[in-house]
A protein has these predicted regions:
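S-adenosylmethionine
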Residues: 1-426
Length: 426
């Protein structure tokens, strides 16, 4: 039996993600150009849907397969088949089962074809009932968030909010994009409506051939509304110098106000990241930005008080972007948060040294963790008393009582971001 291109592509993506050799965004980007628009849509749904339901699917597999240790190829095929049977009504059961079996055969695991066939057929015939240890276990399984991560959010946000956040992380995020320096602006009126909260941002109703053509031509850039909110908070007056410290891949850098009479610098830690940054900026038609390689955690190669605006979009856990990158929840552990917060503080400290008197430091993350956000800023302010919190230039609804800005997937229907604006006293 022939296997559809969409399922082959989805299986390859999920296998690479499960192996730890790719993230979903990169895996999908590598296979989608070779698929038709219809197959591309199904592949996208299969990959992200299976990842969003992975713990639930694995608990179900444990119920039917017992303690049997599953080979990765078999495990991925079972997840893919079970997801279609349980969550995609439009997919015929025989297609989901038969093509999952053939995927296992294609992976040279012919001895497991009977096992895969039997498990998937049991799912179609038998009652789907899973026993839960407690309420947190139920939500952990039903929303496919590791228990330790859910407990962390319960402790920080309260149970109702933590459960709401976990549910929102499994929703398909709205499609947001923005025009680039190459955009004529005319076509955009037909492919999206203006965002209610972020100037220049447009909201689409789904990936279309027209949008993909505009993206390939460099006229639009796909970027979540919250990420664009961070970029919009960077307000620079004429002639003010700007540096984007952790710039790759260039999503926010591409929105910076550039001109031949303004110093704009963007840099990152490695040459491959700079290559990606340069390619991305060129694709967007962005010029007049100086690129620089450095390790911002160790030292920045600039004199003190060089820049009027310093942007630190710090490396982080990414827990605010789980809607777009569902596999993040399975790759994290508690030690990651401590490692990130230590790195973030070192980068922010070095960044503050090159900030001019009266200048502004914009610190942001795509994490919802207080330890990577408010706590980092609190420690920075104790070490740099010349810095003070000033309100970021964003919609009032996002501003917190502490003078920062926060977005959340469940409350705002956008990724979870944090923004702090610090001003150095003259």
């Amino acid at each position: 039996m022939a296997i559809s291109p969409s399922r082959i592509a989805a299986y390859d993506c999920l296998f690479a993600i499960d192996s730890g050799t790719a993230f979903s965004a990169d895996a999908l980007a590598s296979v989608e150009p070779g698929l038709s628009e219809k197959d591309r849509g199904l592949c996208h749904e299969l990959v992200l849907g299976s990842l969003r339901r992975q713990i639930y699917l694995d608990r179900l597999m444990a119920k039917f397969a017992g303690a049997k240790k599953l080979d990765r190829a078999v495990r991925v095929a079972l997840r893919l088949g079970a997801y279609q049977l349980l969550f995609l009504d439009r997919v015929p059961a025989f297609s989901a089962i038969n093509e999952s079996v053939e995927l296992v055969r294609k992976a040279k695991k012919a001895s497991a074809t009977g096992f895969v066939n039997a498990i998937l057929r049991r799912i179609t015939r038998e009652s789907i009932e899973i026993a839960f240890a407690d309420e947190i276990d139920r939500v952990s399984v039903e929303t496919s968030h590791p228990r330790w991560l859910l407990e962390r959010w319960v402790n920080e946000l309260g149970q109702d909010r933590a459960f709401s956040l976990a549910a929102a992380n499994n929703a398909e995020p709205p499609l947001a994009f923005r025009p680039t320096a190459r955009s004529s602006g005319v076509e955009l009126e037909d492919v999206g409506r203006p965002s209610r909260h972020v100037g220049g941002c447009r909201m689409g109703t789904g990936i279309s051939g027209q949008l993909l053509e505009l993206e390939r031509a460099g006229e639009i850039y796909f970027q979540d509304e919250a990420s664009q909110l961070v970029a919009s908070a960077v307000r620079a007056s004429d002639g003010e110098s700007i540096i984007d410290i952790c710039a790759a891949p260039g999503s926010k850098t591409g929105t910076l106000p550039v001109s031949s009479d303004r110093l704009v610098v963007a840099g990152d830690v490695s040459w491959p990241r700079l290559v990606t940054l340069r390619s991305n900026l060129e694709h967007q038609g962005v010029v007049d930005i100086t690129l620089c390689q450095y390790d911002a955690e160790v030292e920045l190669p600039f004199a003190d008080s060089t820049f009027d605006v310093v942007i630190v979009d710090a490396p982080c856990s990414g827990t605010g972007t789980i809607r777009h990158n569902p596999e993040i929840r399975y790759k994290l552990n508690e030690a990651d948060f401590l490692r990130h917060s230590s790195k973030q503080l070192k980068i922010a400290l070095n960044a503050s040294k090159i900030l001019k008197k009266g200048g502004r430091l914009i610190y942001s993350t795509c994490s919802i963790e207080r330890g990577e956000n408010e706590d980092v800023i609190d420690r920075l302010l104790r070490l740099r008393p010349e810095l003070g919190v000033t309100r970021p230039t964003v919609d009032d609804r996002f501003v917190t009582s502490e003078g920062f800005a926060r977005t959340f997937p469940d409350r705002d229907d956008m990724d979870g971001f944090f923004i702090a604006q610090l001003t150095r006293t003259p």
